[in-house]
Amino acid sequence: MKNSRKALWAIPLVSLALLSACGDDNSSSSDTTATEETTATEDTTATEDTTAAETPAGDTGKGEIPEGATEVVIEGDVTTWEGKTVGIANLAPVPGAERWSKPLQACIEENGGTVDFQDVGGDPTKLPALLEGWAASKVDAVFNIGIDMSGQESLIAAFTEAKTPVVIWGAGNPEGAVALDANQEEDGRIIGRYLVEKIGSGQVILVNANNPALQSREKGLTEVLKAAGIELVVVGDALGFSAESAQKSVEAALQANPDAKAVVGGFGSLGVGAAAAVTAAGSDAIVVSMNGDPEEYDAIRAGGPFVATVADGHEFGGEAACQIAANMIAGNPAPGEAGKQILATSVLVTADNLPAAGESEGTPRKFYQLP
């Protein structure tokens, strides 16, 4: 397969905070006002190994754990929250974050706990002050959705010393924290296998942004399409997290690649923008995405080019975080093997299993750790 990256990256330093909000970022600049632009091209060659395109023994597109993984049982008496106070750090007021943080908040408050909910608006530099404040006020637990925990080791250690659980989702895997997440790379494989089944051959456009979770999805997608001999053209702006940005990138990509059979959005908003571009161009390409946000379900329901997404199950992750921390406050150890992320299963969603309007994908999620 030929994998061509045709992306124009424009990265103002003052906006790099958004990139590091969900993981590490290696980009840097000494000028806070200038914009650095680079163009990157990557070529790969197809191999004879096609195992990546095969569905694993556990069908990960139907909420099963991957072959070789170890299931982790989540349990905890949530009535433990009575009279307790916690801090929740939320990346931004977007579905991908609030689908985790809001069920978590509800679980704690409905069981008598008090929540200090803080949204950093995409700015991870606000996290240290929040953690310091929560340490000083001696909260009973700390939660974080999507804000990179790099550099916070000393604060995490202080919480650990105080027996204060730190439970996170999509925020790295720092020592001392219980790290939950979706298997982002596997999400890419799931949507990749769907495309192989639907189009068989040809060219696919991926519109993506520079974020660790999105790059992991790209890696899984690339693996599957490469094995099937399908060409992947990658476009997008580093900070292009909006539907409008994705639409602009895909419109240009379709002009250069009018025979593309499919367009993939790195997450929900990018998929919605891609669908608008495909419609405007009069293209026959199908559009797919990953996340399982309400806007994706609405796009599938509309009956246009948007036909599938991978639902991560953030809601179940929030409920699991509530149970895990409650169990730890009660004096029990964290579940699973220490130091390894606890991953939630995902579900491929099409028109055939689309949730009702206003509802999330309801398949019970399993949690697991990789070898």
Task: Go through the PLM ranges and name each one.
Residues 56-83, 224, 228, 316-371:
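Hinge/cleft segment of the Venus flytrap/periplasmic-binding protein
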Residues 149-186, 190, 293-306:
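Flexible loop/hinge segments that line or gate small-molecule binding clefts
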Residues 85-86, 90-97, 104-106, 190-237, ...:
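An alpha-beta-alpha
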Residues 1-20:
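Sec-dependent bacterial lipoprotein signal peptides
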Residues 57-108, 115-128, 145-149, 208-216, ...:
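Extracytoplasmic "Venus flytrap"
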Residues 69-73, 179-204, 216, 244-247, ...:
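Hydrophobic alpha-helical segments within soluble ligand-binding/sensing domains
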Residues 141-161, 221, 239-299:
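Hydrophobic alpha-helical
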Residues 22-32:
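Bacterial lipoprotein signal-peptidase II cleavage site
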